[in-house]
Amino acid sequence: MWFAVVAIFLALVAFLYRYVVGSGPNPFAIDTREPLKPMVFDRKLKNKVLKQGFLASRVPEDLDAVVVGSGIGGLAIAVLLAKVGKKVLVLEQHDRAGGCCHTFKEQGFEFDVGIHYIGELSNHKPLRCIIDQMTNGQLQWDPLENPFDNVVIGPPENRRIYQIYSGRKRYMDELKKCFPGEEKAIDEYVRLCKEVGQGVWVMVLLKFLPTPIANFLVRTGLANRLTSFSRYASRSLTDVVNELTQNKDLRAVLSYIFGTYGKIPKEASFSMHSLIVNHYMNGAWYPKGGATEIAYHMIPIIEKAGGAVLVRAPVNRILLNDAKEAIGVSVLKGQEEVHVRAPIVISDAGIFNTYEYLLPKDVQTMPAIQKQLSMLQHGDSGLSIFIGLDGTKEELGLKADNYFIYPENNIDELLEDYRSGNREESAKKNPLIFVASPSAKDSTWPERTPGKSTLTVVSFANYEWFEEWKDDKVKNRSTDYKQLKELFINYILEAVTEIYPKIKDRIEYVDAGTPITNQHYIAAPRGEIYGADHGIPRFSAELNATIRAQTPIKNLYLTGQDLMLCGFAGALTGALTCGSVILNRNLHLEAFSLAKRVQNGNNKKKT
């Protein structure tokens, strides 16, 4: 007994020294923002940064780390290490860097694939400060309209549209106008979201604490009592909302944003939901110049420290020594393997790809790895539709906002029926359609692509519906596959043109990306939108104490959304967590500290 107490005490002391006092280099030691430089719109110039192909001769010597995957989790950890002088190589299997932050161009239209809107980017907010430091202050943001989201419920003949405003008071006041008599429910919902969301630090704590202490907190149940976030983690969004109100439309409106983390309300943790509600409570933004601006401004920081970001570099395995320690990666170049050695290997490829594809079979069977895999499931897959339009946003009635379209307010039942149906029938009754205009959100669009506009649509779609065509050539899949895509496109377009009637005769381009499209371009094993599943089990104390940046393989680390949470901000948080472990310093606290110093400095300038 006493031995255990002493061991836990010593582990706690070590933790406090490592993550509170801070012993390693600090990438947030100084404010690295620079004066804004002119934006670059020339695609050839941008491609020189974003599309640097892999060659053995381009691999820097004496690497400090190699990162698999160039999504925001991979680029961010590379930038953090580069800022303290580390030489990092980032390897991307696609032909351009950025992961879900990349864009593509078809018939003169540019489409983003994953960045729709981001919250918490007011000046001096910690997230804004982190991104400013990651891009040396070169990434600019355009605010969305207020209201930024529109929730559409019901068929055309009985349609109700509820608008979601930013600003806590405005958000509540506008909802109360729509739902008289429900003031108490709305007040309690907003209060709960704030209280629960503020306790998210417990997730980070469990990943940082020494394993004996974390396990002690889990076994004794103390971890579930630390914050409201812990206490509500096992409660579904449906249960919490249903306790607040009997009004079915209000229930749907309070739940509408579940699509941004990919779980239907009855399967979603209220703790996860509270984070998203708080994330957008004070507004939403879109990257000025499009999503490629993110990677475009991060890569030079990696290169300045001697590193590189190389594309068309499919990593086929992680190299291990005889002691089963990671010592580098193997890249397939044609039929040959190129070995890249580094003392640290960081995977932004997702936990399933990392453990089930990149590690040897005998290592995959390690109990510690199997335990982690048993705790997770693949997330839900999705369908994206890309629409190119002839006309300006003014001519077509497009705004910098989003629409969430539901055929009725019984969301759980609609989605369960949709997911359990056969693919042809389900294509005709899509229960959730997210639609937005990236071109209307980007203030540089009229200069870059005059007279044209775009819409992007996202919805759920089962991987199994498309799985039979996964081995077809990407640009030459079968006629049956194309016909199924057309079926989904046609029925979804009906709903979209009801919201945007002016686009009916102005569509010049339309195509869809299915789960197997995601599988090919972003290496999502089952076409997942948000990596590992974000349902209730994802938020258990045991899982968060078990899945850490440091994997069971020495020198192999995880970064990105599978380590922490989904989405841009979640993957970025995963990079901070990974960097904290590698650099022996709590980068979450350091980022908050720098944000405070920058804010105080600006306040002094004003006075």
From Swiss-Prot:
EC numbers, comma separated: 1.3.99.23
Cofactor(s) annotated in UniProt: NAD(+); NADP(+); FAD
Principal location class: endoplasmic reticulum
Keyword Flavoprotein among record annotations: yes
Enzyme class: oxidoreductase
Catalytic reaction annotation: all-trans-13,14-dihydroretinol + A = all-trans-retinol + AH2
Keyword Acyltransferase: no
InterPro entries referenced in this protein's UniProt entry, alphabetically: Amino_oxidase (IPR002937), FAD/NAD-bd_sf (IPR036188), Retinol_saturase (IPR052206)
GO biological process, one term: retinol metabolic process
GO CC, one annotated term: endoplasmic reticulum membrane
UniProt entry keywords in alphabetical sequence: Endoplasmic reticulum, FAD, Flavoprotein, Lipid metabolism, Membrane, NAD, NADP, Oxidoreductase, Signal
Locations listed in the record: Endoplasmic reticulum membrane
A GO term, aspect molecular function: all-trans-retinol 13,14-reductase activity
Signal peptide segment: 1-22
Membrane topology qualifier: Peripheral membrane protein
Family recorded in the similarity comment: Belongs to the carotenoid/retinoid oxidoreductase family. CrtISO subfamily.
Role noted for this protein: Catalyzes the saturation of all-trans-retinol to all-trans-13,14-dihydroretinol. In addition, saturates the 7-8 double bond of all-trans-retinol to produce all-trans-7,8-dihydroretinol. Can also use vitamin A2 (all-trans-3,4-didehydroretinol) as a substrate, to produce all-trans-13,14-dihydro-3,4-didehydroretinol or all-trans-7,8-dihydro-3,4-didehydroretinol. May play a role in vitamin A metabolism.
Protein name, per record: All-trans-retinol 13,14-reductase
Source species of the chain: Danio rerio (Zebrafish)
